[in-house]
Design a protein with these regions (language model features):
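Short beta->alpha linker loops
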Residues: 33, 59, 82, 195, ...
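Conserved core of the sugar-phosphate nucleotidyltransferase
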Residues: 112-189
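A structural signal for short hydrophobic beta-strand segments in well-ordered beta-sheet cores
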Residues: 29, 142-144, 212
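Conserved N-terminal catalytic core of the sugar/cofactor nucleotidyltransferase
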Residues: 1-9, 35-101, 190
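Glycine-rich N-terminal loop/short-helix segment of MobA-like nucleotidyltransferase
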Residues: 2-32
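Conserved beta-strand segments of alpha/beta enzyme cores
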Residues: 28, 73-75, 209-211
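Short beta-strand-to-loop acidic/aromatic patch adjacent to the donor-nucleotide binding site
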Residues: 100-110
Length: 243
């Protein structure tokens, strides 16, 4: 049985590349076949045995507040600085409310629930869910030494080799994410828009390695722009439904 019962969802982003679709709502509320990304994700988490979900909010946060009123397992922590900071600050802003193993997720994901079980059952306390190449645009590429994180970047030229792509679901131990918080604190003045994935790379070393669990044909997508949404509707969702 998994010892992880908490999930953190990073949901503060503006979603500006989706233009009119996210002017008045967060991108987690985009719908696929009548259900929002966020509510589908919450359902997957609850089914996986997660009983506490903390959502880091920002843009149009009232939508998440309304969602939390329907789920006793959900609480929200709002970041007043969401417009000028990155995903790592959204996570850092929750630091006083977290001290247990957790799953860290992005809010704009459409994914098969098997990925959650893969992480929850993985023997490493710190493990990133990864996939094979998606060719979706805006990928975060991962370099490993076989099964441990070495580097991550959206720029292929910054990596020695590309072994996988970041899905946006990670299992983290308190020790690792508190190291990420400390790194965020030390770099905030110069890098306020720090992404959480860069903080993971910064704290991953020989003494604190982060595993990478790759599922080659894993059905998932992040929805950051119109092309991602069309891929979700035409390719990813049919694969999830039929599996």
């Amino acid at each position: 049985m998994s010892t992880v019962h908490t999930a953190v969802i990073l949901a503060a982003g503006l979603g500006s590349r989706l233009k009119g679709r996210t002017t008045y709502m967060p991108k987690g509320f985009l719908e696929i076949e009548g259900q929002s990304l966020i509510e589908r994700s919450v359902g997957h988490l609850l089914q996986a045995g997660i009983d506490r979900i903390v959502i880091g909010t920002g843009h149009a946060f009232g939508h998440y507040r309304n969602l939390s009123s329907r789920y006793p397992q959900i609480s929200c922590i709002h970041s007043e600085l969401y417009a000028s900071t990155g995903s790592m600050y959204t996570f850092y802003n929750m630091r006083n409310d977290l001290n247990e193993p957790l799953l860290l997720l992005e809010s704009d994901l459409l994914y098969h629930p098997s990925g959650l079980q893969a992480l929850l059952q993985h023997p490493s306390p710190d493990v990133i869910l990864a996939s094979g190449a998606t060719h979706s645009g805006d990928e975060v590429f991962i370099e490993t030494d076989g099964n441990r994180l070495m580097n991550m970047s959206k720029k292929q030229e910054e990596l020695h080799h590309i072994d996988a792509e970041l899905v946006g679901i990670t299992k983290l131990s308190p020790e690792t994410y508190h190291r990420m918080f400390a790194y965020c604190e030390s770099t905030f003045n110069t890098h306020p828009k720090l992404d959480y994935e860069h903080a993971m790379v910064a704290v991953s070393d020989d003494g604190h390695s982060i595993a990478v669990h790759k599922i080659d044909q894993y059905p998932w997508c992040e929805i950051d722009d119109e092309s991602h949404l069309q891929r979700a509707l035409q390719d990813v969702w049919p694969r999830i439904k039929n599996n």
